[in-house]
Regions:
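Small-residue-rich helix-loop
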Residues: 37-142
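Short, hydrophobic/amphipathic alpha-helical patches that form generic packing surfaces
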Residues: 26-30, 69-76, 149-153
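Short helix-capping/linker segments at secondary-structure and domain boundaries
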Residues: 33-37, 79-80, 157-163
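Non-catalytic, well-ordered alpha-helical scaffold segments
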Residues: 21-25, 65, 69, 145-149, ...
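Short, mixed-charge aromatic SLiMs
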Residues: 3-12, 51, 95-98, 138-141, ...
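A conserved active-site cap/scaffold subdomain adjacent to cofactor or substrate pockets
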Residues: 1-52
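Charged substrate- and nucleic-acid-binding regions of tRNA-handling and nucleotidyl-transfer enzymes
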Residues: 123, 127-187
Length: 191
């Protein structure tokens, strides 16, 4: 209703009533950030239908619902929301963006060999995952900021993702481990 009042046609052509894309973008951002996750997911499904995108599987929908808590606040529109959540919409094997592959060649993959088995037993919540990853970084004498881009590549195929910890919690233990193993096997064979 508020958008209808702001963008009515009564005074079109007069300065205050001009169609302002910046204002529209702001309204869209506020709407996305303040909409209940289930309602937002329903709107996103409708958007995908309108733009002739394939429908999402139940696994993708469940993952999106879990990830909206930490992704919806930083986007202005549905295309950005989809991009921000692309990690959950990808199926294995994960294709790695070309801009990330050169970082992989410089990365000691032994870090993943140490991390992956330990993920089997850790309590699967953000704080415990953060503790474990920091501990593994200490073991291999690397800073987390050095390891994070490779984890992003393994989990999402990209460097533009939400937090590694948030992605891991949304993907779940099994999917996270499978993605890390596939990544390690692929790049151990290529390097």
């Amino acid at each position: 209703e508020q958008a209808k009042n702001w963008f009515n046609l009564k005074h079109i052509g007069k300065s205050p009533s001009r169609f302002d894309f910046k204002k529209l973008s702001n309204i869209s951002k506020l709407h996305i950030a303040n909409t209940d996750n289930a309602a937002l997911l329903h709107e996103l499904i409708e958007y995908l239908n309108v733009v002739d995108q394939p429908s999402l599987s139940q696994n993708h929908l469940n993952g999106l619902l879990r990830s909206l808590d930490f992704t919806k606040s930083s986007v202005k529109n549905f295309p950005e929301l989809i991009e921000k959540n692309s990690f959950i919409l990808k199926d294995r094997p994960i294709n790695i963006d070309p801009d990330v592959t050169e970082k992989i060649e410089e990365f000691p993959l032994k870090t993943l060999k140490i991390l992956t088995p330990q993920l089997q037993n850790v309590k699967w919540d953000r704080s415990k995952l953060e503790e474990l990853l920091n501990s593994v970084c200490e073991q291999v004498e690397l800073k987390f900021r050095t390891v994070a881009p490779i984890l992003r590549a393994a989990l999402a195929g990209s460097s533009k993702t939400p937090s590694v910890f948030d992605m891991m919690t949304v993907l779940g233990r099994e999917e996270t481990i499978e993605r890390l193993i596939e990544f390690e096997v692929k790049y151990n064979n290529e390097i």
